[in-house]
From Swiss-Prot:
UniProt GO BP: nucleobase-containing small molecule interconversion; pyrimidine nucleotide metabolic process
InterPro entries per UniProt: Cytidylate_kin, Cytidylate_kinase_dom, P-loop_NTPase
One GO CC annotation: cytosol
Positions in coiled-coil regions: none
Protein name as annotated: Cytidylate kinase
Domain of life: Bacteria
Key word S-adenosyl-L-methionine present: no
Cross-referenced SUPFAM superfamilies: P-loop containing nucleoside triphosphate hydrolases
Keyword Disulfide bond among record annotations: no
Class of the enzyme per the UniProt entry, highest EC level: transferase
GO MF term set: (d)CMP kinase activity; ATP binding; CMP kinase activity; dCMP kinase activity
Amino acid sequence: MNRQKVIAIDGPGASGKGTVAARVAAALGYDYLDTGALYRLTALYAQKQGVGWHDEENVSELAKKLPAVFSGSRILLGGEDVSDGIRTEAIGMGASAVAQLPKVRAALLQRQRDFLTEKGLVADGRDTGSVVFPQAELKIFLTAESKIRAERRAKQIGIPCEGLAFERILSDIEARDEADRNRKVAPLKQQPDALLLDTSRLTIEETVKKVLDWYREV
């Protein structure tokens, strides 16, 4: 099978996968796919429709007809801008829940693959390198210490990196890590053919440069 013009980036929540992937895509002139957004959209859509996140049959049916549109940096669901709404920790937990459902993953698989064109693609999210794009030219497992990830998330939403609100963010991130590592379907783990990139002591710019350097070497 021929290699695919894809960079696949996996890793834990709040590790900066999306920011790094988007910047790498821009630098290369490739398209960008946030696969995690599709699961977040599915979780939000299910919530809006009154469907429980563990209801595999009904959630998978919603995933098949997900009325989502990616417009630049904005994400629309049924015509409503939900770019910020899908980024809450609660919806993140919902995304982790629906992503454990095999029928939901199957429903979204082809939709993810359809994003790949001759232009090239940078995709971030679980299973991007092992299942969605197994012949990707470069596969990366991007991670950082949980406290560092919590600090980055806190700065992103404008709260101090201390106090109860910060501790809640850290607790949520660690709980999600634990759930993702131990789930039966697509658990969080580095694949054998993926390069490990710990960004705990790296800036975004340094991380992007590292990814681009690796890609030029493949």
